[in-house]
Amino acid sequence: MKRSKRVACVEATAVVALSMTSAGIAHADDELVVNTNPAASREAPADLSSLKPVVNVLAAPDTSSIVPDTGPSPYVPGVNTQSGIVTDAQTRAYGSFAIPYTTGRVQDGNQSALGTTSANFLSTTYPYRAIGKLTFSAGYCTASLIRRSVIVTAAHCIQSFGSGSAIYSGWQFRPGHYGASGATSAQIAPYGTWTWAALVRPSTWANGTDTGSGAARNNDIAVIAIAKNASNQFIGDLTGYLNYGWNNYSFVSSSKTGNLQTASVTTFGYPALLDGGAIMQRTDGPTYTTTVSGASQLWQGSNLTGGASGGPWIVNFRARDAVLSGGAAVGSSPNLAIVGVTSWGSADPNASKDNYASQFRQNTQYPNATYGNYGSGNIASLLNTLCTTAAPGGGTFASQGYCN
């Protein structure tokens, strides 16, 4: 992966460290930043091609001796759906042994940018359109919607590890982005360009004390509230948004897979290695839980390199349900859910490819089983901190509808 320069904060002027630790209240390891100048400079579509992918610049730890976890999660798995929190000890996933994978463009038919409209692009249909390119002062990453107007990405897309209050600036989100040569403005931003309103990243990422070594860290995760557009609309009302799960949600251990904790996971991103980061890419394959230098990680074969950072790792992914025949019964429907975001992986395009994600889960920094109405562990705490924060215009981001 390529290195990116560190850029000091330009717009963000309110940094808040929270110290309350009881269940349901923001955890001490959350740090909030509010955009006090949302009308600040924005990149023009023509400038996007000059941006570089932002990657995790920390050194990769030694992975020569890592092995997948074989035991179950010590915590109760759960998923936050649009109907509320569901805890399910019988979550299911399907996969095969070893780490094979497939990668391809998210497209439908002939996806030439010339002579077509955004309606032809698979990336503008749900659930793909809840994923998009996140641009900012240092380059670009990938992000996805997990609440009505909240996206999740990697903490290293907010700031360099251990850089304190020095963060990047100018975050903008383009859901369903397609930027191949000759793309029209409607294809580049089919649902518009959206500006950040506030963000939360772990204080242990900011101060450089997060559990792990090098790039492998417990909490390379951040959430960003997206401001409403000029028509006073929330982004999620146009695109929809995705569920998120925690604590090995949909992972299972079976003798068929060597008693490894595994799930079938689909990951998305805009890696610079593939189509120059201009087109959304998808990787499918079995994924395992593991521990690298003390950090809880998800592990998958993948060639989604720099630019895919912050992209979602989704279990039970499906876009269109098939019609069953031959007497087959539907059975209980598994929940599509994001269980982590891309953090780091192999940088050599000709070497064995593997990627790692900071897992959504309870851990040393985020031990609580409940953070407000948002579930367990790191992802829930970050959301709880963001959503209970005072928002411009009065009330909180939750009361204004951002976190529905």
What are these regions (language model features)?
Residues 134, 143, 149, 153, ...:
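Terminal peptide-recognition signature
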Residues 217-304:
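Chymotrypsin/trypsin-fold serine protease catalytic domain
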Residues 303-341:
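Catalytic nucleophile loop of clan PA
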Residues 335, 339-342, 346-404:
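C-terminal cap/linker of serine protease catalytic domains
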Residues 124-178, 285-292, 301-302:
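Catalytic histidine site
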Residues 28-145, 376, 381-404:
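Protease-domain processing segments flanking chymotrypsin-fold serine proteases, especially trypsin-like
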Residues 18-25:
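C-terminal segment of classical bacterial N-terminal signal peptides
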Residues 106-129, 138-140, 168-235:
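Conserved catalytic-core segment of clan PA serine endopeptidases
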